[in-house]
Amino acid sequence: DKIYVAGHNGMVGSAIVRKLREKGFINIITRSSSELDLTNQQNVHNFLQDEGLDCVIIAAAKVGGIYANDSYPAEFIYQNLMIEANLVHGSYLAGVNKLLFLGSSCIYPKDSQQPIKEKYLLSGYLEPTNEPYAIAKITGIKLCESYNRQYGTDYRSIMPTNLYGPNDNFHLENSHVIPAIIRKIHLAKCIEKSDWKAIKQDIKNNPIKGLAENSTNNQILKILAKQGIKQLKTQDSRLITDDSQLNEVEVELWGTGKPMREFLHVDDMADASIHIMDIDKKTLESEVDPMLSHINIGTGTDITIKDVVQIVKKVVGFDGEIVFNTKMLDGTKRKLLDISKLERLGWKPVITLKDGLKETYEWFITNNKVVRVR
């Protein structure tokens, strides 16, 4: 099969490409955003017509954290709607047999009953901070369902839980929870051990606002303290700089650490994506309704943020303290997907959170130079 993976440079898209190759697929088509602007309808349609594809996987999207979603809502809804519409409609016009649309668990109402079943879609109000993005993702599901109903296509949708893994975004200001925790604790460990070479390499590869390659150690400490990575002072108020001992460092994280979250390694997500695409159409239709066809992808288990932090602390090898700033809001107390349909369709995750976090940290250290900054 000739498969086009849209968004192959992102965390999810790159994982899908790796998994496809691992499973023996060799005819994989990719285009960078500079080669193909997915918001340009005519260019997308021409590309799909010319390639003669058997399958399209939509892992491309404009994504970002709470601040970005809240600050640029027009960009989030417009770009995501255009990407989805151009690829779905263009695939139909080009006679593409199969398509897989990757959404997000933010499609569900903010006060959904737990665990969240697929049928809870459109049953309540969305989280206001990312509503435009969520509406675009819901539209992607409905595009696939509508084309299936009207044109008899085989376009499928999956909704992953919180993802993490290689090629994630580790920017301190706009990354998701796991990469943010990993990088903060990594930098804290470097301060703890007075490894200024590693700290400056990290800043060079992943810029931090207010810092440059020639910033002094004290300037670095001052800026990192604003990010919650603090070297504590001695009794005489001088910063500890003796390499013969571990410096006393603490990491401050927002909230109580009590919220429960579900985390899925992106390689498991990629495996689930291919599994869903490979399922016979009749078998899939026995589990999903034509107008409620999306499938949750997750682990079926959740964990407190505090427990995740302790695992990361151990994986990184940080000996300092973790402090939770309880004055900051926690957000949703619990967010867990019901994966009953996924399990009945024969798929379960295999990567444990501990193993996944260990692998992700190793990747971060090894590939620091290529970590993307959004």
Predicted regions and their residues:
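C-terminal substrate-binding subdomain of Rossmann-fold SDR/epimerase-dehydratase oxidoreductases
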Residues: 7-11, 15-23, 186-374
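Conserved Rossmann-fold NAD(P)-dependent oxidoreductase catalytic core, especially the SDR/UDP-sugar
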Residues: 85-130, 156, 169
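Short-chain dehydrogenase/reductase
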Residues: 77, 81, 129-141, 171-179, ...
